[in-house]
A protein has these predicted regions:
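Heme-based O2/NO sensor domains and their adjacent alpha-helical segments
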Residues: 2-8, 21-110, 114-120, 127-133, ...
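Short, Lys/Arg-rich amphipathic segments at extreme N-termini
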Residues: 8-15
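Surface/interface-facing alpha-helical segments and adjacent flexible terminal/loop regions used
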Residues: 13, 74, 141-144
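Short, contiguous alpha-helical
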Residues: 123-146
Length: 162
């Protein structure tokens, strides 16, 4: 997506930090209301969950590396989501909550932005966050937050250039 002839990152097009904070807040509110997805939060969650989630998404979508610098790496995030067995219904409902949160946060007006954000969240939910069903101890050390651009997952050295 271009703004004044300059290519924007998905992070910028989503409204930067403020846009992703709105999205994280809207998604969190929706999942807490969903009878299936809310189970993932039934044992409590970090008091700054929304801010941390927005920082994670920001880093993945071409924004600042605040999450990795202040909170942890991909290994930590994947371990938090691992060891719970398969949960396809929960994943699909979390994605549906995300799609509704895009509307709530005002990020669904631009179809290209809506689609890329949906694709990112659906990919992350059904791959990186649900890869280790048996045990969080199976998650390898040293994982980096995957980067996502307008064209999908960014592989290799170009991940630092989005």
């Amino acid at each position: 997506m271009k703004y004044n002839g300059i290519m924007q990152t998905v992070y910028e097009a989503a409204g930067g930090r403020e846009g992703l904070l709105r999205l994280a807040s809207a998604w969190h509110a929706r999942v807490l209301e969903d009878e299936v997805v809310a189970h993932a939060f039934s044992h409590g969650y970090h008091p700054q969950h929304t801010e941390r989630l927005a920082a994670y998404w920001a880093e993945a979508l071409g924004g600042p590396t605040t999450y990795s610098e202040q909170y942890g790496n991909e290994t930590l995030v994947v371990r938090m989501h691992s060891g719970n067995g398969p949960h396809e219904e929960m994943d699909q409902r979390a994605i549906a909550c995300f799609d509704q949160a895009l509307l709530d946060a005002g990020l669904a007006r631009d179809e290209r932005l809506r689609r890329v954000l949906h694709d990112y969240f659906a990919w992350a939910t059904t791959t990186t966050m649900s890869r280790y069903h048996d045990s969080a101890e199976d998650v390898p050390d040293g994982l980096h937050i995957p980067k996502w651009s307008w064209h999908g997952i960014v592989r290799g050295a170009e991940a630092d250039d989005i």
